[in-house]
Amino acid sequence: MGFWKFSPFLPLSILVLYQVGIIQAAPFRSALESLPDPAVLPEEESRLLLAALVKDYVQMKVRALEQEQETGGASITAQKRSCNTASCLTHRLAGLLSSAGSMANSNLLPTEMGFKVSGRRRRDLQA
């Protein structure tokens, strides 16, 4: 009984597919094989295309070099990365303290002070 419900649908679908062009008497590929492949260029056109690509590339490089010469090459600057970890900060503070300590030793301490002066005995002072 279900077959009778689909019988009018079958010829209608065949007619629609025929009109769309899916069903043909001749194979569809034979028509495509006779056409030349659009991706294949003749040798002369491929040479012209290659020459145009090379010319554009050279012009682009010349413009980049001219811009670099105009700016003087100063557009690229090297910067040291800042480190914010605890070990980097400790190392930086230790460097600052050591440089501050060396400045304090050379500038602020009197010349008569030192490890040899503070431990002198009377005998050394009289001699």
UniProtKB/Swiss-Prot annotation:
One of its GO terms (cellular component) is extracellular space. Residues 1-25 form the signal peptide. Pfam families: Calc_CGRP_IAPP. GO terms for molecular function: calcitonin receptor binding; hormone activity. Disulfide bonds join 83-88. GO terms for biological process: adenylate cyclase-activating G protein-coupled receptor signaling pathway; regulation of cytosolic calcium ion concentration. The keyword Signal applies. The keyword Chaperone does not apply. It comes from the Eukaryota. Its main location: secreted. Residues 26-79, 124-127 form a propeptide. The modification Serine amide is found at residue 118. Keywords: Amidation, Cleavage on pair of basic residues, Disulfide bond, Hormone, Secreted, Signal. It is found in: Secreted. Belongs to the calcitonin family. CGRP1/CALCA is a peptide hormone that induces vasodilation mediated by the CALCRL-RAMP1 receptor complex. Dilates a variety of vessels including the coronary, cerebral and systemic vasculature. Its abundance in the CNS also points toward a neurotransmitter or neuromodulator role. It also elevates platelet cAMP. CGRP1 can also bind and activate CALCR-RAMP1 (AMYR1) receptor complex. PANTHER family: CALCITONIN GENE-RELATED PEPTIDE 1 (PTHR10505:SF13), CALCITONIN-RELATED (PTHR10505). This is Calcitonin gene-related peptide 1. It comes from Equus caballus.
